[in-house]
A protein has these predicted regions:
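Feature captures hydrophobic
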Residues: 1-188
């Protein structure tokens, strides 16, 4: 992933840089053709105060708005404090990774997924980032993935496999285990 300036505003990150990186990721991997005929919708909610919506058609046409959209495929929420600290510490891999690595397999997995998964990402200073993701507007079943920010970056970069992390104790999973396993295609 491109190095993101640690002083970038949330608005600039989510309205300009993130869509640019996602588009470049799809183009450079040659995945636009496989995404023809798809419409990926994403909503990012920061503390209920700021909302960013994305509609990506055919993997090439990106429409970004600073307002909510109805029935997004994926809705992500986190606190403004967590978002600002994620930017300042360069720990954006888990948040931005799926957008930059969208494939038809991940799109299809998301389309069929119904539930909520949470990530609790522990920082070196002991603080924790909390990211909540709701798929297809359904918030049950629920599972929580607990890992370090360093390990989450490795998952996003495909340097660590989630199942291996779970088996070795690097990641803990709480909640609905079947749903947790259903999320695996998003991270592999």
């Amino acid at each position: 992933m491109e190095t993101i300036p640690t002083d970038i505003s949330i608005n600039e990150l989510l309205t300009e840089l993130s869509p640019k990186l996602a588009k470049e990721g799809i183009e450079s991997a040659g995945r636009a053709g496989e995404l023809a005929g798809t419409e990926f919708t994403l909503l990012v909610d920061i503390d209920g105060d700021s909302t960013y919506s994305y509609v990506v058609k055919d993997g090439t046409n990106f429409d970004v708005k600073t307002e909510a959209i109805a029935d997004p495929l994926v809705a992500i929420s986190l606190s403004k404090d967590d978002m600002e600290k994620m930017i300042a510490t360069g720990n954006l891999d888990m948040l931005l990774g799926i957008q930059q690595d969208l494939t038809i397999a991940k799109y299809n997995a998301l389309k069929g997924m119904k539930g909520c998964f949470k990530a609790e990402l522990k920082n070196d200073d002991g603080s924790v980032f909390n990211i909540k993701t709701i798929c297809n507007g359904i918030d049950t079943p629920t599972c929580t993935f607990k890992m370090t920010t360093a390990d989450s970056a490795k998952v996003a970069k495909k340097e660590l496999h989630p199942v291996n992390m779970f088996m070795s104790g690097q990641m803990q999973i709480e909640g609905d285990m079947a749903f947790a396993m259903a999320t695996q295609p998003l991270f592999t």
